[in-house]
């Protein structure tokens, strides 16, 4: 404060979607402390992710709602805005479903972040940024810019060893953040 420098936002990632109740409760306590810190430091925005486990979507979805029901009244009371993005390997990776989760609370204190390097996860490899941003509508509060390759196309990324998961299936997500223009993201569509 003495220097005049202000912080525009924090970014935190807690396991508020579980998949275990112990993880969720611990995350909610961490969230409460982070909210206190944001208020004390006059930081109006906290960016975050859904977290959870894509292999336990139903459980994690319920845990996220339980966490939000506990935290959103505090967030609203303190006048903060929480902006949520879907991240690869979260319980919810799809754009429209993520937007629906945010929209379901009908709160101006809860917004949706579109992260362009995650866009191919958001619509299962189509990369149709125009329709995703249109669907987000008024809940869209923030866009993160970086390029990436479409991970669904053949030979874009190689993950070794092939047995990365003992359950006998691929349980790995791969993406990267590149400079704009170095990958497959439709930036013209974003800027329209």
Located regions from the model:
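Active-site acidic/histidine proton-transfer and metal-coordination neighborhood
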Residues: 3-9, 15-114, 121
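Acidic/histidine-rich catalytic cores of soluble enzymes
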Residues: 10, 69-179, 184
């Amino acid at each position: 404060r003495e220097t005049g420098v202000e912080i525009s936002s924090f970014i935190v990632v807690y396991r508020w979607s579980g998949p275990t109740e112990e993880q969720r409760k611990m995350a909610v306590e961490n969230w409460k402390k982070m909210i206190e810190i944001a208020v004390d430091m006059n930081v109006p925005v906290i960016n975050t992710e859904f977290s959870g486990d894509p292999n336990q979507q139903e459980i994690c979805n319920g845990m996220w709602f339980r966490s939000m029901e506990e935290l959103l009244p505090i967030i609203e009371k303190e006048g903060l805005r929480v902006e949520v993005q879907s991240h690869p390997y979260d319980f919810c990776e799809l754009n429209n479903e993520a937007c629906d989760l945010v929209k379901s609370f009908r709160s101006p204190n809860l917004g949706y972040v579109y992260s362009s390097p995650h866009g191919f996860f958001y619509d299962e490899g189509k990369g149709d940024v125009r329709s995703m941003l249109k669907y987000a509508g008024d809940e869209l509060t923030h866009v993160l810019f970086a390029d990436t390759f479409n991970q669904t196309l053949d030979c874009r990324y190689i993950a070794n060893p092939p047995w990365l998961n003992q359950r006998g299936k691929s349980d790995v997500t791969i993406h990267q953040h590149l400079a704009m223009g170095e990958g497959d993201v439709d930036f013209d569509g974003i800027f329209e």
